[in-house]
Amino acid sequence: METGSPGKRPVLPKRARLLVTAGMGMLALLLFGPRLVDIYVDWLWFGEVGFRSVWITVLLTRLAIVAAVALVVAGIVLAALLLAYRSRPFFVPDEPQRDPVAPLRSAVMRRPRLFGWGIAVTLGVVCGLIASFDWVKVQLFVHGGTFGIVDPEFGYDIGFFVFDLPFYRSVLNWLFVAVVLAFLASLLTHYLFGGLRLTTGRGMLTQAARVQLAVFAGAVVLLKAVAYWLDRYELLSSGRKEPTFTGAGYTDIHAELPAKLVLVAIAVLCAVSFFTAIFLRDLRIPAMAAALLVLSAILVGGLWPLLMEQFSVRPNAADVERPYIQRNIEATREAYRIGGDWVQYRSYPGIGTKQPRDVPVDVTTIAKVRLLDPHILSRTFTQQQQLKNFFSFAEILDIDRYRIDGELQDYIVGVREFSPKSLTGNQTDWINKHTVYTHGNGFVAAPANRVNAAARDAENISDSNSGYPIYAVSDIASLGSGRQVIPVEQPRVYYGEVIAQADPDYAIVGGAPGSAPREYDTDTSKYTYTGAGGVSIGNWFNRTVFATKVAQHKFLFSREIGSESKVLIHRDPKERVQRVAPWLTTDDNPYPVVVNGRIVWIVDAYTTLDTYPYAQRSSLEGPVTSPTGIVRQGKQVSYVRNSVKATVDAYDGTVTLFQFDRDDPVLRTWMRAFPGTVKSEDQIPDELRAHFRYPEDLFEVQRSLLAKYHVDEPREFFTTNAFWSVPSDPTNDANATQPPFYVLVGDQQSAQPSFRLASAMVGYNREFLSAYISAHSDPANYGKLTVLELPTDTLTQGPQQIQNSMISDTRVASERTLLERSNRIHYGNLLSLPIADGGVLYVEPLYTERISTSPSSSTFPQLSRVLVSVREPRTEGGVRVGYAPTLAESLDQVFGPGTGRVATXPGGDAASAPPPGAGGPAPPQGVPPPRTTQPPAAPPRGPDVPPATVAELRETLADLRAVLDRLEKAIDAAETPGG
């Protein structure tokens, strides 16, 4: 073994150097290889969907941020290290036994450049990588414009607060980080080389160390002065007065704002005092200035606003906060589009004055009453329309409308998707799972206002073939038959909500020309994908990349993969939109529609902000539960617009973004940042526009805000007396709020069917109905909100009270006992419908599901009864309840004979309903024929009574009840002591 000369470092043998190099290469590959694979796959995928420009723009923006921040941080830190090193003392006392940093100093002295550059570059790169997540702020700053609205305090355009201010704050934060790191680096370097020595009872600083540390400390304080200046503008989004209102209140404007200016001045003086240390040896002046700044921050910035809030504002809050509440009301209405330009308020009595059959609008509403609940019927769809075990429908179905033979009809719709979780046995083999079972089959719809037949026999209701949807199926089997109610030319579904539940989510499709198809299509046919979607894996490099990404060697050795093969990834419609437009927030509920013969997913997308001055903060997304069980509030926003409608083709995965709000300055900013990615509103096809729905997530935010922001007067707003609440869901034991519901109702002007999203509202901490909010989805009036306000001096029952009244009705209670012997009962969506020229009609379907003890048997809900309720005329709180197998019979019970004749009767086909009373049972597809036992005939109803006579009798009874109520109250008052 050779030894080097004394003083020289030992040299590794060649073999050892090779091993070290190989080891470092393997380590680098393990660290950076997966990320490089992801980058290359993203490059391929974004190119496939036609949005590679988005990927490149985001990547270049993040790289530019990394470079800029790394350069600034590394440069400042390196300068600090270099200055400290060059100004080190030439003589350091050689006392190793008393100098604990001597070994470290020796190591640094051997390689000073490596340590200096290494520390600076490492810190710079780490800071740059963290800062790259602020790419959204950079793009908004570079491309942001104006709103044309100024804030009420400083008079600046809103664009300054949402586009510029976040960027300035981010730049300031990173400068602050850089200077603090430089200060620490300088401090440690001076300590290491003796410029700073700590001895018993005192410390010693060289002049160079004192100057450098003072300059960096002064720079930190100077940056803090700039931060105080920017804090002034951020007060307009203050949360001090939450939950009452968001934005600067009296204390913020009269205490916090002046305090910030005072602190700016003190911080500047403090910084100057630090800079004087360059000339003065005495550090007591900077120390006293720093103490003054800290004390001022506590007293002026903290204690003074606290005292003002406690002793001046709170005792007089209703008066002193009035102008600031007014600012909050105006800003919130603008930010969420719930102001007078978008919301129409109408007084509504809450008590009907006419028979619904005599009001054209009500005739339309009753004929279109939705009886099918998309939250309940998914299992019914699956059991009756599944075809194969590996097909399934979404857990919650969707509601849409189609015009069939000139008539607008709402349908419960779903896509028969491939369900990876449903594969069993050999179906789960890799070849079968990813190359054979690749797609779903068909679009299934059912008219929402009727079922095949009424279920009458309560004792044998689960054995009857009644209460099931009437299906309109558009799939491979019906392709080209001419029998499709909703024509679909390409029923195969490769992209969907259910199909994307595989982990990992991918399918391998395609084949060489002339090769035998292998994808399952039907029991008698196979198929080869011919769509434009998918990333090519025809070459060995791409196959190796995907084999690495999903950790599956079969990509390399399977004979099923050839030169024409492609892999379909990211098959969830919502995820695809989020990836191609990362600057948008997507709605949680994509829904399928048929447009020009193709199945297309529509995804509502929002532009959002969280710094809109004075606008109330709200959550656009629901609470998020972490894996550890911690519940966190969803993303908080102060501005939201449904500015983009996105579509995803279910066959080839094509993503298209359409501008839907030309007036949104945030969308205009993003369209400048990513030109060509969003198509103009003029390019939306009329057939597609006809299926746009008002999104549920946005509506839920708006209705919760309208519960407060319908109030105009700030003092009344502060007292909360006129507030509303979103009612609890009476059909959900989890005490959740009642979800909004889509309905077809008669338009007030034309009496034609109008598709709307609606919700009842109750009084604040009460259960009586206070308002009814509906959002139009028809193209002509899309986005218009209508609010029907009920008087506060009359009592109209809310959803929870109506539910209690209906289930406590003697007829309902007695039959429920009978039904529950062999069935589970599901209460469907409780619909609130304006009707009878001022009244409110509640309709609730009741579903039963047979209880089975056999694990092999399948049960699913069927519509068994319909409950309706209306307020009793001329009474305080009285209600009428209807309960029958059909809507028509229930309506006759509450309105008298004749009203039920305008309801849609059971039966018919999916394209057209039978005339009232003409519907007979028609077995739905996939359901076995009914048993031979016939349901008992309905009991005789007796002689018909003229409707006028019935109405007179009801009015007389109502008058008698009112008299008895008043008499009972008088007796109670007389018996009460002191009364």
Curated annotation (Swiss-Prot):
Keyword Mitochondrion set for record: no
Intrachain S-S bonds: none
Listed NCBIfam families: PRK00068.1, PRK12438.1
Family under the similarity heading: Belongs to the UPF0182 family.
UniProt-annotated stretches for the region Disordered: 894-948
One Pfam family hit: UPF0182
Name of this chain's protein: UPF0182 protein MT0070
Membrane topology annotation: Multi-pass membrane protein
UniProt entry keywords in alphabetical sequence: Cell membrane, Membrane, Transmembrane, Transmembrane helix
InterPro entries referenced in this protein's UniProt entry, alphabetically: UPF0182 (IPR005372)
Main location, first listed in the record: membrane
Localization in the cell: Cell membrane
Sequence ranges of Pro residues compositional bias: 913-946
GO cellular component, one term: plasma membrane
Transmembrane segments: 19-41, 63-85, 114-136, 174-196, 208-230, 261-280, 285-307
